[in-house]
Swiss-Prot record:
Any single GO CC term annotated in Swiss-Prot or TrEMBL for this entry: chloroplast
Known function: Catalyzes the rearrangement of 1-deoxy-D-xylulose 5-phosphate (DXP) to produce the thiazole phosphate moiety of thiamine. Sulfur is provided by the thiocarboxylate moiety of the carrier protein ThiS. In vitro, sulfur can be provided by H(2)S.
Pathway(s) the chain acts in: Cofactor biosynthesis; thiamine diphosphate biosynthesis
Catalyzed reaction equations: [ThiS sulfur-carrier protein]-C-terminal-Gly-aminoethanethioate + 2-iminoacetate + 1-deoxy-D-xylulose 5-phosphate = [ThiS sulfur-carrier protein]-C-terminal Gly-Gly + 2-[(2R,5Z)-2-carboxy-4-methylthiazol-5(2H)-ylidene]ethyl phosphate + 2 H2O + H(+)
Name of this protein: Thiazole synthase
Keyword flag Chloroplast: yes
Keywords: Chloroplast, Plastid, Schiff base, Thiamine biosynthesis, Transferase
Originating organism: Gracilaria tenuistipitata var. liui (Red alga)
Amino acid sequence: MSFNLISSYLHLTKPLIIDNKSFPSRLMLGTGKYRSLRNASISIRNSSASIVTVAIRRAYNNKLKGKSSLLDGLDWKKLWILPNTAGCETVEEAIRIAILGREMARRLGQVDNNFVKLEVIADSEYLFPDPYGTLKAAEYLVSNNFTVLPYINPDPVLAKQLEEIGCSAIMPLGSPIGSGQGLQNLLNLQIIINNAKVPIIIDAGIGTASEASQAMEMGASGVLLNTAVAKATNPEYMAEAMKLGVISGRIAYLSGRISKQDKAIASSPSEGIFIK
């Protein structure tokens, strides 16, 4: 990245703030589906992500089986762990896994980390989140001092309800998890962004850097992705591309897009000397 771009970015943008916690990067990265732990570690480093999300069920299962884990290989003094409740189908299960996630963060030395990415998934084919279950679980977790980041369908009404009960950020999906279909419901996503008083993190469905940039150009506060990097032909390069996509999209949003016009508007003057 050029020095001028870095200077522009630092001048224009501020850190991402979630529940009074400051994060330099607006890109969050998942830890699943990588070909190897080394591959994952280098990709996370190349992305410059500040927040890394970990599926607590998978982490505990690996521990019980004696398998090595990214949890052991990452520097948790530099990275902020975002435990997630992926795989939970009920409110009760999501709450139980969230509590385990907070305990895991404590063991990694992040004693003030109450973050949880809340997922309640009742649809096994498309992995769409359960809106009712998400709202119920969020109410309980917020009341028990969790910093809740709920994963939801792009539903502006639900997003506002979750904000009003105390969720610290909202994570609407761009398209189904792992599908790589990009941002499918632009209207609803834009409404959610426009109406929000908390950070909006676009999560799921992003397939390449231009789509990460598009999310940021819309005014999203950040982007969370996993499959687009982990399953890329070269994950380590794709992580770098996603970092640059998020940065360029954020700069474009802050710079102010020109308005669309119905007709062409000449960029060169029509007045002046006529030359035969």
